[in-house]
Regions:
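Ribokinase/PfkB-type carbohydrate-kinase core domain
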Residues: 2-31, 91-105, 117-170
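Glycine-rich phosphate/adenosyl-contacting loop at the front of the ribokinase-like
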Residues: 2-79, 84-98, 151
Length: 170
């Protein structure tokens, strides 16, 4: 249904219930520290580290959680995989007050993941799987216009990791 006619057709008041819909990169980050980044990893080498911390990252999680903590009504719109990482993202975002109704499970794409290698000074290097968000297209957004119509604004990032959207940018 066209959101421009939703109010007239349904008698609904199109009050903006969501302050911001966060779209795009939605990631599970695995923080590995300390890693001596100045030394090549090399084959067969064991690096002893602190316990690996698993958290969320990407613009959807980072900005979404920050906005929710500022008492904004926010929602996530992205693809996740059909895997355990998707469950972790959904739980973390839900626990932080981010609406996850529009986190879409992609049938073939994996949830985006990153190994974040951190040295003693805080410098970071990344090993990243873009995963399902790279499969987002203009249709992914157009098919959810009713959801976006409930929002005051949207924030999309990172375009370079979503190549199927680049051709649709002005």
């Amino acid at each position: 249904m066209d959101p421009r006619t939703l109010e007239a057709d349904s008698g609904l008041n199109m009050e903006k219930l969501i302050d911001c819909v966060l779209c795009g990169s939605c990631v599970v980050d695995m923080l590995v520290r300390p890693v001596p980044l100045e030394v090549p990893i090399g084959g067969g080498r064991l690096m002893q580290t602190d316990p690996i911390e698993v958290t969320t990252g990407g613009i959807v999680a980072n900005a979404g959680i920050a906005m929710a903590r500022l008492r904004m009504q926010v929602a996530a719109h992205s693809y996740v995989g059909r895997d355990d990482w998707a469950n972790l993202i959904r739980k973390r975002l839900s626990d932080e007050g981010v609406d996850v109704r529009s986190l879409i499970t992609h049938p073939t794409g994996a949830t985006s993941t990153t190994a974040v290698l951190v040295d003693d000074s805080g410098e970071r290097s990344f090993a990243h799987c873009v995963g399902a968000p790279k499969l987002m297209t203009k249709a992914t957004f157009l098919e959810n216009l009713e959801f976006f119509a409930l929002s005051r604004m949207m924030l999309v990032g990172y375009y370079s990791l979503m190549p199927n959207l680049e051709g649709d940018l002005p």
